[in-house]
Amino acid sequence: MSFLNSWRAVKYTNKPKEEDIKLPNSASNLPTTVQACVIQFISSLVSPVHPQLLSPEELAKAFQNFYKHTDEFIASTLIPQPSSKDQNVPLLFPEEIDAQKKARQHLLNQKDEWMDQIEDIVCEYLYDRIFCLSTSTDAAKDDLLKKFIASEEKKELINCIPIPDDEKLTNRLHEVSEAFFALDEQHTPRSKINTFMTVNSSILNASQLPQEELNADSLLNLTIYCILCYPGFHLISHLNFVLRFRNADFLSGEQRYCLTTFEAALTFILRACPNLLTQSSIQPSDDPLSLEVANSETVSTSNSLHDPSAEPYPVNRSSLSNLRNLGLALEKSYASLLSKVANHTAKSSEDSSNSVEFVGDPPLERFLTVSDASDLKIGEIELLLSDYKRLARLLFEKNGNQ
């Protein structure tokens, strides 16, 4: 069975041939050997030779392995390696050595451009099959988010978000949320992540906060509000698409920071309404986003593709320094929201304040004690999000008892 077919056919008589896969004209810029690698990868995913559909995690690993192996292939076969000192090579003039260094650097830059182009070609070719995967819960979560935004409980959540009470600010955030519609027309991870980055930047500009008040704490609150203003659909699917299929080695620290902020905001919103969760196919114990790719640390080889115990692909740890700042900022946001919960639920019953105390210490205390931000693992953000989920449930459970 094909990995990417959302339907289950009874007969598979015609196996697609690699020569039947036509790449776009833009692929002509790639070396012929690289084009062959791209066609072979696409064929491996659409050919009916596999026993079952790939899970989102397995498919993400397949893409990341493909990116990794293609990058290594280009580097080893198309880029001349620097000569070893032990090799017998003719002496060169300084000008010749400098020219060789420049030529090699040009090829390295060209390799990165090729890798971006390869990602675009593969993801756009397979977009209808890999966006909002049938083996994932993306569609159910998108529907849950849409229902929440259309419900009255959205207003209750907005009232608990610590943002300035400024009508002009909220109007600007409504306008910023319109930028999310561009995601529906974009079919590559690069284009989608650029939209998320644009929205993130626009939120900062719309806040018009003084520089000393412009931090990740206020950004998270404004991001939550901006998402609640978005009347569209598939926002979770768009975010998961980026996290699954964007080349992990090409994600900058700023981009990871941006994606983590949207992940935290969406997770908080999805956990804010237990009533809707009980009416959906998603159980309250489920991870709302299941962004497994963002929590990965190591990569499996192609031979371990079907092994569920295999380690996922690597994260560039050097680009995670911004997560420490995010942890510090979310720490303050957590305390602020907890205070609002306590004030909100105190009117409910005499023992409501005791119910708030079980939340315990602020999230991810070790974020404040780590000496080197490069020691942080992006998977640790799950612990922070779980505290937000618990806090959101507490807020609306108490609100429902009033």
Curated annotation (Swiss-Prot):
GO MF annotations in UniProt: GTPase activator activity; guanyl-nucleotide exchange factor activity; small GTPase binding
Any Pfam family: VPS9
GO cellular component, one term: cytosol
InterPro entries to which the protein is assigned, alphabetical: VPS9, Vps9-like, VPS9_dom_sf
GO aspect biological process, one term: vesicle-mediated transport
Subcellular location: Cytoplasm
PANTHER family with a match to the protein in the record: GTPASE-ACTIVATING PROTEIN AND VPS9 DOMAIN-CONTAINING PROTEIN 1 (PTHR23101:SF25), RAB GDP/GTP EXCHANGE FACTOR (PTHR23101)
Name by which UniProt lists this protein: Vacuolar protein sorting-associated protein 9b
Organism phylogeny: Eukaryota, Fungi, Dikarya, Ascomycota, Taphrinomycotina
Gene name tied to this protein: vps902
